[in-house]
Amino acid sequence: MDTFNVREYLKKDSFDIDEYLMMIGWAELLSREEEQALVEKAQQGDEEAMNLLLWSKARFVINLANQYTNKGKGVSLQQLLNVAMPVLQKAVLEYDVHNEDPLIKYAVPQMREALEKI
């Protein structure tokens, strides 16, 4: 299966969350070594590597965003994902691959901060 382009999909005016969940379900979990290699490539401008990283972390981002859907602000899951995914992308670019913590642990506080501002 071709790589699912998470960023392009989220740019749509609206999307079918069930279709989105199905597509991200195809993403393989990455080993620490695979993640580090993709981060290094993404930091060098490799768009495919960036997309693979975002795709592999999309399930986690959905779980995180879902924590903010019932805050009484009337914000849709799509809006929350449109906030969280660019933050994850920025975290990929800033992440130190020599850090002992996984990428997602580095990115979560930044995503939470952005989601809390909505």
Name each region found by the language model.
Residues 2-118:
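Alpha-helical promoter-recognition and RNA polymerase-docking modules of transcription initiation factors
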